[in-house]
Amino acid sequence: MSLQAIKFDRQKTRLDILDQLLIPYQTKYIQVSNIDDGYSVIQKMQVRGAPAIAIVGSFSITCELNSVKDGQKNNHGYDVSDLSVFKAALEKRIDYLIKSRPTAVNLVNACTAIKAIVETACTIDDLYAEVLRYSVVLFEDDLKNNYRIGANGVRYIDNELSNFEGPFAVMTICNTGSLATSGHGTALGIIRSLWAKSKANPRNADDKTIQGQKSWLSHVYACETRPYNQGSRLTSYELNFEKIPFSLITDNMPAYLIDSLFSQRVNCPLPSRAPVKFIIVGADRIVTNGDLANKIGTFQLALIASQYDGVKFIGAAPTTTIDYTRDSGDDIVIEQRPANELTSILGGQVDSSDQFVTDSEGKVNLLRIKTATPNIDVWNPAFDVTPNRLIDSIVTEQDYLVKDSHGKFNL
């Protein structure tokens, strides 16, 4: 990708994040100087994706420590002359940061790890150095792990397709790519890795054979992902940039699309005739029994997949997303988002020829449009929980996991 979602300058201890609310209309970076800034960009979803949230949260703590460790700034009760008071103030600030997005476990895990560093630090300088080191390693490890997730996902898919020949399609929801992580992505990382393998011996995607491969990825279906439209704004941006063949669909189209492809319905024009063989999603939290919390709409995709023997449902996430403190999905706190996020939409203004309208600086004019009846009741959960019985595989950087003979994941 030409765009980095997260930029951290270690020499200057400076963090800048790409404002993802403006993509694909504008490219704008926001400086995150402290925990308040980190809370704001996470809560407003200017940065999103469980791994990215954890990384930005960790770096925001690092930046705040850098500004207070030498007494340059003394807000929020920091006292550089008293280590115990300093630590207590920092722990209170970290607890505040955790509340920005309660469902994503990666942020909680990262903050918990940093609090352990706080507890054992002997000096403020040592504390800063260790938090900086932890944050940088978190960022670097996430990128390495994403490539491993991609490779493990391809291994699982190859095994499942051992008796299948020809082109196939996959479906995904939300955005789980470079914009949601340090790079490559989780679920979208698997799709990237699949596409890299499929185009190794380029042919027409609908040819009967590709040299050396019995089956190959030929098409991706990206769900729009209402109400924040991460699929239409972000995933479509990434797929388009990498020239991976894809079609954008609304969140209420998957059942009819999959059924039409399986039945080869001739009276229904389709972007590709390759059947959907896998639905690949990310996760904001996976609990001990394998239940998976992800973007709202994921559960219904798993239900659809369960109706077709030939469609496998895959959850992809690093092991940092696994929450061993909760036994089942019933224990997951589901974040509720503001009503106006469902009843209005932000987009780029277009003219009569469907071209973007720009200002004198060449920036696309952004407009917020009301799309619903005013003053109505709204239910707007950000996530849902997919029960483990509907999940065929959980792919991590360590391996791909399938259920044992008792129908359980051994996480």
From Swiss-Prot:
SUPFAM superfamilies the record matches: NagB/RpiA/CoA transferase-like
Active site residues of this protein: 284 (proton donor)
Cell location: Cytoplasm; Nucleus
GO cellular component: cytoplasm; nucleus
Keyword vocabulary terms for this entry: Amino-acid biosynthesis, Cytoplasm, Isomerase, Methionine biosynthesis, Nucleus
Pathway the protein acts in: Amino-acid biosynthesis; L-methionine biosynthesis via salvage pathway; L-methionine from S-methyl-5-thio-alpha-D-ribose 1-phosphate: step 1/6
Biological processes annotated in GO: L-methionine salvage from methylthioadenosine
Site (Transition state stabilizer): 174
Reaction catalysis annotation: 5-(methylsulfanyl)-alpha-D-ribose 1-phosphate = 5-(methylsulfanyl)-D-ribulose 1-phosphate
Broadest EC class assigned to this enzyme: isomerase
GO molecular function terms noted in the UniProt entry: S-methyl-5-thioribose-1-phosphate isomerase activity
EC number: 5.3.1.23
Pfam short name (any one): IF-2B
Family of this protein: Belongs to the eIF-2B alpha/beta/delta subunits family. MtnA subfamily.
Function (record text): Catalyzes the interconversion of methylthioribose-1-phosphate (MTR-1-P) into methylthioribulose-1-phosphate (MTRu-1-P).
HAMAP family reported in the protein's UniProt record: Salvage_MtnA (MF_01678)
Name by which UniProt lists this protein: Methylthioribose-1-phosphate isomerase
Organism: Komagataella phaffii (strain GS115 / ATCC 20864)
Gene: MRI1
